[in-house]
Design a protein with these regions (language model features):
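A compositional/biophysical signature of low hydrophobicity enriched in polar/charged and small residues
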Residues: 1-110
């Protein structure tokens, strides 16, 4: 299954609610969301900076990955999020090799 990285920034209201009732949202919210689409949570970390939470998930496809983020966004607890598709080293090299085929046909606008 493909891997995705979610980066999530909470709203101030969400932080206030979490401070009143501290719990590991990685386990109580993220893991069940992944499992609901037939995937699994590989790992999750709280962080500081532009985002408050980073998750690595293994879900069946783009549709499943989008479903998780749509449901989370609809809940209103996020002020920003970012989803990144992750590739293995082998997949990255495979993509590099395929650029030769694309380069033969692609003509940039100039």
């Amino acid at each position: 299954m493909p891997l995705y990285m979610y980066q999530i920034a909470y709203t101030p209201e969400s932080w206030a609610a979490q401070l009143k009732n501290p719990q590991n949202r990685i386990e109580v919210a993220a893991r069940p969301a992944c499992e609901a689409v037939g995937g699994k949570l590989v790992g999750g970390w709280y962080c500081f900076g532009d985002y408050d939470l980073v998750l690595i998930v293994d879900v069946p496809n783009n549709e499943s990955a989008a479903a998780i983020m749509m449901a989370v966004a609809a809940g209103g607890a996020m002020k920003a999020s970012k989803t990144t598709v992750l590739m293995t080293g082998t997949e990255g090299v495979g993509a590099m090799k395929k650029t030769a085929d694309v380069t033969r046909t692609y003509k940039p606008a100039r």
